[in-house]
Design a protein with these regions (language model features):
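Cytochrome P450 catalytic-core helices
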Residues: 55
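Long protein-protein interaction modules used by eukaryotic assembly/scaffold proteins
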Residues: 8-16, 41
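Conserved G/P- and acidic residue-centered "switch" motifs that form tight phosphate/ATP-binding loops
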Residues: 215
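N-terminal leader/pro-regions and domain N-caps
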Residues: 2-7
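A conserved glycine-rich beta-strand in the N-terminal activation segment of trypsin-fold
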Residues: 31-52
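Serine endopeptidase catalytic core focused on the charge-relay Asp
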Residues: 18-26, 34-35, 61, 69-203, ...
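Histidine-centered active-site/metal-ligand motif
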Residues: 58
Length: 216
């Protein structure tokens, strides 16, 4: 029996943010709607440690955040679930007799229960804050290797100034270099980040050549 590979050996030189990002596909039953991006956040649920999947409100709602009456899909279909591809933890039985091979599995996450109640969470201001989260649950956290973005050591020496270089992680048009690792798109801070008004709130404009599929 071959010993299962360890995360320390396989990922020693890998940027950990690559495992905080996740590629999404919104679905209406079996119909693929739109590719998108998201990331993991380690928090709590009902007082217990938990992982959350964070993406944009418009990805899960399937509606334009600025015009919520407008569906994003050309046929007007709204998502009933999303498909994500997750890295199996190395203690899972699928790794037995495998030689340093890493395995990913598709995981379907329903967005609504049988009575039509949403299983995802939005801001109290709904589409005005284009952010939504999905509780991944204990099963997913125990079976898959997840890295919360807040578990990656922060760079406290990074200044947020206009003109500074930034990178946007995601999956342009659903593309990935290796199964689920994101593409890093280079950009720059294009607005003054230290001026806040009632209109700008905490928004910062980023100048970058992004593509559809990087929402999230």
């Amino acid at each position: 029996m071959t010993q299962a590979p360890s995360a320390e050996n396989l990922f020693a030189n890998v940027e950990p943010l690559n495992f905080s990002a996740v590629r999404l596909m919104s679905l209406r039953d079996d119909l693929e709607l739109e590719p998108a991006s998201g990331f993991f956040f380690h928090g709590t649920f009902d007082g217990h440690p938990n992982y959350w999947l964070v993406t944009n409100w418009h990805v899960l709602a399937g509606r334009n955040a600025d015009q919520p009456g407008q569906a994003l899909h050309s046929k007007g279909a709204l998502p009933s679930g999303i498909r994500v591809q997750l890295l199996l933890r190395f203690n899972q039985p699928e790794y037995l007799n495998r030689n340093a091979e890493i395995l990913f599995q598709d995981q379907f996450l329903s967005l609504y229960d049988n009575e039509g109640h949403a299983l995802w969470y939005q801001h109290v201001r709904r589409n005005d804050v284009d952010v939504a989260v999905v509780n991944l649950g204990r099963y997913v956290a125990e079976r898959f290797y997840l890295v919360g973005i807040n578990e990656v050591p922060a760079r406290n020496d990074m200044a947020i100034e206009i003109g500074n270089e930034v990178f946007i992680l995601g999956y342009p048009l659903g593309f990935t270099h290796f199964v689920n690792t994101p593409i890093w798109k280079r950009g720059s801070i294009a607005s003054e980040p230290h001026i806040e008004t009632a209109e700008t709130k905490l928004r910062v404009v980023i100048d970058a050549t992004t593509r559809g599929g990087m929402s999230g």
